[in-house]
Amino acid sequence: MKLKTLAKATLALGLLTTGVITSEGQAVQAKEKQERVQHLYDIKDLHRYYSSESFEFSNISGKVENYNGSNVVRFNQENQNHQLFLLGKDKEKYKEGIEGKDVFVVKELIDPNGRLSTVGGVTKKNNKSSETNTHLFVNKVYGGNLDASIDSFSINKEEVSLKELDFKIRQHLVKNYGLYKGTTKYGKITINLKDGEKQEIDLGDKLQFERMGDVLNSKDINKIEVTLKQI
C-alpha cells in the first residue's frame, strides 16, 4: 500500500494498530512512520482480534462512496449499518460498487455514527453446497523441540477471500494450539496452491489491509502449512 493511501486508510478507519479511534494528529504521525502501522499489534491485541466474532453475509449490494479519500460501500444487515472499505485489489475491481456479493465481515471499529467498519472480504455469491477439505499441517517449534500435527480445514465456498482464510485459520490456532497465549506469537501461515504458487502470512502481525481484498479459488488450494514459534 502506498504511503498516501495508507495514511488515508488509517485516518478513515480511525485506528492505528490497537483498533481504537485516534486523532488526526496521530494519523499524521502514522503517515510519517509507515512501517509501524501494521507492526505494533502486541499479543493481546492479536488474541482479541482473532478471537472476535465474524459474520458471513450473502447477496450484498451497494454503490462506492468516497470517505476521507478511501472507497467505501455502505449497507445494512441484521439491523446494523456497515461500512466496507475497499483498500486493495478490490478497489480496482469494484470501482462503481458491488452487486449480489458475499462479504466476510470482521469488526474493525464502530464509528461515532454507529456504523461497523470492516475491510475487504468480498467474493462472488457462492454455492452453499460447495465444500473443500484441505490438510492443515501445524508445526510447533519450541526451542529444539518440534511437535507436528495434521488437521482437516474445511472451506464451505468456492471463492474465498484471503481475509477469511487468515481469520479462520488463526482462530483455529488460537482455540486449539494456544496462539497468542504466553509467548506464542511468531511464525507463519503458508497457503500452497496446486500451480506451485503460495500465499504467506506473518503470524506476528495482523493481515495487511490491502491483502484483505485478495481472493482464491478453494479448489486451487493444495495444502496449508503453519509454523508456530515460541520465544
UniProtKB/Swiss-Prot annotation:
InterPro entries: Enterotoxin, SSL_OB, Staph/Strept_toxin_CS, Staph_exotoxin, SuperAg_toxin_C, Superantigen_bac, Toxin_b-grasp_Staph/Strep
Localization terms from the record: Secreted
Residues of the signal peptide: 1-30
Major localization listed first in the record, in broad terms: secreted
NCBIfam families: PRK13346.1 (NF009887)
Family under the similarity heading: Belongs to the staphylococcal/streptococcal toxin family.
Its job: Plays a role in the inhibition of host complement-mediated lysis and serum bactericidal activity by interacting with complement component C5. Affects all three pathways of complement activation and inhibits the cleavage of C5 by preventing its binding to C5 convertases. In turn, prevents C5a-mediated neutrophil migration.
Subunit structure: Interacts with host IgA and complement C5; these interactions inhibits complement activation.
Record protein name field: Staphylococcal superantigen-like 7
Organism whose genome encodes this protein: Staphylococcus aureus (strain NCTC 8325 / PS 47)
Recorded name of the encoding gene: ssl7
